[in-house]
Structure formats: C-alpha cells, structure tokens
Design a protein with these regions (language model features):
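ASCE RecA-like P-loop NTPase motor cores
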Residues: 1-223
C-alpha cells in the first residue's frame, strides 16, 4: 500500500529526527497513532558478523507486519531460503539480501527486485515496522477485551430495544475483527481502534519538532 509506505517513511523520519516535509489534511494530522517510542522499540538492527537466529527473525518480521513469500517483489515482504534472507523494508527503495555463514551474518547487500542482481554491499540493515500498529498476541487479546467490554452495554441496549439489525451488525463487526487479528491477516481500518490496543497515543502534530514550520492553506476551510 503506497499510502502506508509513505506514512511509515514520515514516521521513521520523525522518530529518528531526520528533516522531512509533510503535506496532509488537518484531519490526517490529528489522527491517533501509537507513540513513536513504540516504533523505536520494535526496530530490528542487523549488521555484518552478527549472530542471527533465522527462526527468531522470521517471528519478529511477522509481528512487525511483514509478509512471508517465496520471493521478494514488493515492500513489506520477506523470504527465507536456506541461509539467504531477502527482505524489502517498507521504508526503503530496494530490497536487501542477507547471506549467512552458519549462524553469522556474512554479507548484507541491496539488490534489484526484478533482475535479482546485487547493487551494493552495506554493513548494516535497519528494519522498521510495516505498519503503524505492531500487534502481538498479548496486545490483541487486551485490545479485543477492552473493545468488547465497552460495546457490551450498548449491544445489550440494542438487543433489549429489539434493534436486531444494528445489534447483529455490531456483533458481526467485532467477530470479524477478532478473527482477522487472531489470524494476523492484513487488516484495513484497524487504526480506527488504536486507543483500544495502545494506552499511549499521539497525533502527527504531537510528533513534530519544536522548531517545525506549519503552513495552512485555505484557512477558511480549516474553520
């Protein structure tokens, strides 16, 4: 998703203090997201000569929202074949290939996704989450519990007042969300529930540095 990729690149720059220009609607600037500290917490750093457990790496990448595939073609995908790991970080322009020697990282190089030809060797690879929300099983369970607890009185009220269609719709939406989250499948719109899964949320405005310049176009529409 191109929009997700651009948003994650902006968040990466804000988290690392890199300069960036953001063009967005007022609503988008005030949308809730997890605090940037969560993003920093889940970053994966891999460097040459580092010991690396591939099973552990696979689990971490899945938790970060990356999709395991047979071959890497798009951002947000990774593949493991023997002692070779290909990954296309969401915030990078090209994929990376990690060659292992036993349990140690031998080389890290960028490569072209179409031709599979190597571009250049690098010493380190930094992998950021593939989405704004990193949802472990524990966080999913807590979030679903909070959501169900909040909606339970409302759902009961609908049921008691014989608003059966509205009641069935709410129950269905919760069941679908729960099923998708449990299966760790791609979920669109889950960011609408961010407050249920994270106790510490912010907006993009909160993440801007103190010396940031803010320009508002068409101020009449803002008010």
């Amino acid at each position: 998703n191109a929009i997700t990729r651009r948003r994650m690149e902006v968040l990466r720059r804000l988290a690392t203090g890199e300069p960036c220009t953001i063009i967005a609607t007022v609503d988008a600037m005030y949308d809730k997201i997890p605090a940037l500290s969560y993003m920093k917490k889940y970053v994966i750093n891999i460097h040459v000569a580092q010991s690396l457990d591939l099973d552990e790496l696979k689990g971490k990448l899945v938790d970060l929202g990356y999709e395991k595939t047979d071959s890497v073609e798009e951002p947000g995908q990774f593949a493991i074949r023997g002692g070779i790991v290909d990954i296309f970080p969401l915030t990078e322009e090209c994929p990376y290939r990690i060659d292992m020697w036993d349990d140690e990282v031998d080389t890290i190089k960028t490569f072209d996704a179409e031709s599979q030809r190597s571009i250049e060797n690098v010493d380190e690879l930094v992998i950021y989450p593939a989405g704004e929300m990193v949802l472990s099983k524990e966080r999913i369970d807590r979030g679903i519990h909070r959501l169900e607890a909040e909606l339970k009185p409302y759902a009961k009220k609908l049921k008691d007042s014989f608003q059966t269609e509205a009641y069935a719709r709410i129950k269905g939406e919760i069941a679908t969300l729960k099923e998708q989250l449990t299966e760790f499948s791609a979920i669109y719109g889950v960011d609408s529930y961010v407050d249920y899964f994270y106790s510490d949320t912010v907006s993009l405005v909160d993440c801007l540095p103190e010396d940031a310049y803010i320009f508002i176009d068409e101020t009449k529409k803002v008010t």
